[in-house]
Amino acid sequence: MLKEEDKIFTNLHGQQSHDLKSSKKRGDWDNTKALLDKGREFIIEEVKKSGLRGRGGAGFSTGMKWSFMPKNSAKPCYLVVNADESEPGTCKDRDILRFEPHKLIEGCLLASFAIGANDCYIYIRGEFYNEASNIQRALDEAYKDGLIGKNACGSGFDCNIYLHRGAGAYICGEETALLESLEGKKGMPRLKPPFPAGFGLYGCPTTINNVESIAVVPTILRRGASWFASIGKPNNTGTKIFCISGHVNKPCNVEEAMGISLKELIEKYAGGVRGGWDNLKAIIPGGSSVPLLPKSLCEVDMDFDSLRTAGSGLGTGGIIVMDKSTDIIYAIARLSKFYMHESCGQCTPCREGTGWMWRVMMRLVKGNAQKSEIDELLNVTKEIEGHTICALGDAAAWPIQGLIRHFRSEIEERIKGWSSAI
């Protein structure tokens, strides 16, 4: 369990003002110049030592990602912050944008300095109107105070940060589709390689990081990599914001240590499952893109490795709780419809497969299908998984795979009930 003094996001629930004066009282922008004076290599190495892994879902080492940027590029380098949070069940970045904007902006400055980028873009979800307003106000305050812009914090480093609003496409959360959108084109994922670190925004070296990944950097540098690495578990270090929604008594966002038990997280912070733990049916532990877990597996630790072993994933940390009143087949069918709607249509397996899967899922919801179609559906998910340019195909396939893996008997009963009624 995370100690109060180890919390990074001390205004996560907006109890205090998010303006610059209040943010400074909470420790933001505290002698940032001294951190910059330590040099780029120090910052990258410290982030590496901390064990910070990307908080957007992939879990790749943040420091390692920064080290891929060229040291002496003839082209300008860019930092892009992915604030296009659109994953069903996920709202952690939204609260950072709302209530902790200066943590993000300070993190942008430090990360930009580390990778040699004089320009940073925050790409924010189009629907986040109020959050975009908060970020813009915070940027204006930071510019006025000399914290960013020319000679940021008096360090001699120039760093301009721009806010760019998206237009409501979930696919633009994929890093290369985001770059396409930022360039003014239709948001469609690029083939990799080349990777953004070599050929990113405007064909220049670019690093793309999640909001939470960037916002924790200033605290890591102030308190030290060893402090951050001491929280959580080996290879799964630090704190994480978890979003708990669904059939719980008190839905909430909470910052906790990586590796906390899923059951403890729900019972301590969300008031427990509606109707008690025995009324639990299943949980999606990491946003809609990861396979669900049945009640028998729901005391798993919330970290990358433990959830992978359990057959799911940490993803974004968006925990969706479903009690026994849930029509689990329809719940997953609803997610199938979401992915069908959000597919950009570039890859045939995803373009054709997501629609096909949704139509079959809706027949399974009614029971109007043959039992053989369950295996046929599973085979189609495996044909889509790993055969698309981006991970949206995987995201569409995994919820269905989880459903069939753990609730096949319920699907078969639904089919049997329909057949008996005819």
UniProtKB/Swiss-Prot annotation:
Binds 1 FMN. One of its GO terms (molecular function) is metal ion binding. PROSITE patterns: COMPLEX1_51K_1 (PS00644), COMPLEX1_51K_2 (PS00645). It comes from the Bacteria. [4Fe-4S] cluster binds at residues 344, 347, 350, 390. NAD(+) binds at residues 54-63. Keywords: 4Fe-4S, Flavoprotein, FMN, Iron, Iron-sulfur, Metal-binding, NAD, Quinone, Translocase. InterPro entries: ComplexI_51kDa_subunit, NADH-UbQ_OxRdtase_51kDa_CS, NADH-UbQ_OxRdtase_suF, Nuo51_FMN-bd, Nuo51_FMN-bd_sf, Nuop51_4Fe4S-bd, Nuop51_4Fe4S-bd_sf, SLBB_dom. The keyword Iron-sulfur applies. Its cofactor is FMN; [4Fe-4S] cluster. Its EC number is 7.1.1.-. Residues 16-26 have a biased composition (Basic and acidic residues). It is an enzyme of class 7 (translocase). Residues 1-26 are annotated as: Disordered. FMN binds at residues 166-213. It catalyses: a quinone + NADH + 5 H(+)(in) = a quinol + NAD(+) + 4 H(+)(out). Belongs to the complex I 51 kDa subunit family. NDH-1 shuttles electrons from NADH, via FMN and iron-sulfur (Fe-S) centers, to quinones in the respiratory chain. Couples the redox reaction to proton translocation (for every two electrons transferred, four hydrogen ions are translocated across the cytoplasmic membrane), and thus conserves the redox energy in a proton gradient. This is NADH-quinone oxidoreductase subunit F. It comes from Rickettsia felis (strain ATCC VR-1525 / URRWXCal2).
